Amino acid sequence: MARTEDDSWEITESVGATALGVASARAAETRSQHPLISDPFAQVFLDAVGDGVWNWHSAPQLPAELLEIEPDLPLQMEAMVSYMASRTAFFDEFFLDATRAGIGQAVILAAGLDSRAWRLPWPAGTTVFELDQPRVLEFKAATLAEHGAEPACGRVAVAVDLRQDWPTALRQAGFDPSVPSVWSAEGLMPYLPAVAQDLLFERVQGLTVRASRIAVEALGPKFLDPQVRANRSARMERIRAVMAHVEPQREIPRTDELWYFEEREDVGDWFRRHDWDVTVTPSGELMAGYGRAAAAQVEDRVPTNLFVAAQRK
């Protein structure tokens, strides 16, 4: 389903369904023998919505017809779980480092099914603001409440579309822009047009003071590469054709239709220009650092995103 200017979605639709895919990877990592992260709530979300393509990571075996045309698919899925686990660990550590250093306000942009407000050991007095579409936040809170889960911090849900005036909504929810804060933008950039990305950062700039921090999963150098896009599209069309025959109930989202393939300013450069200290870690380096490097056969199928960490001077 192609994007429109004011589109919205249920958790099983469009951008919402991609959050279930991330939850599936986190659940798979949590079940693994030596998990890098622990997200006990990821499987709770999957159980709440029932069967779908997002459950592939928990399937005992992929369809034989699928493995016949994509023999490396299990390795690719394993690599994506490792990518998501590394990404999750990066943001977990970023938030905990900042809050343990005395920052008392955390803001999660496009929170999706992120359960950090429930699962991380936040310092006493920390307030976590979660921003996302109303139906996504409602589903998350209701599902976790049904399972008796309680936030481990002062969680504040800010139900707002990031294309709207979310800074006003954030301030009205109790956010104090006069004291340091820590922010995340994880899994968000491809869903924003270039102009919206700039506006997002400008708004963060207007809500932060010295010593504030932000971590961003930025688009990597191959995001716009036409050959990379063509290869991914062809591979996914082969998979869709098989799945339409053997498991038609598992519709595979056309992710490329949800993303904005536009030239945009490098995220690290943007924050440097606006007086932030910046470090950038390529995804391959991040994964290797966690001992989760992708297998050579499929390393070209793992996102080449950049993990940006910045602190305002």
Curated annotation (Swiss-Prot):
Domain of life per record: Bacteria
Classification via Pfam families: LCM
The keyword Transferase is annotated on this UniProt entry: yes
Positions annotated to bind S-adenosyl-L-methionine: 132, 161-162
Enzyme Commission number: 2.1.1.-
Matching InterPro entries: Ppm1/Ppm2/Tcmp, SAM-dependent_MTases_sf, SAM_mthyl_Trfase_ML2640-like
A GO BP entry: methylation
UniProt keyword S-adenosyl-L-methionine present: yes
Family: Belongs to the UPF0677 family.
Function in brief: Exhibits S-adenosyl-L-methionine-dependent methyltransferase activity.
Protein name: Putative S-adenosyl-L-methionine-dependent methyltransferase MMAR_0955
Record organism: Mycobacterium marinum (strain ATCC BAA-535 / M)
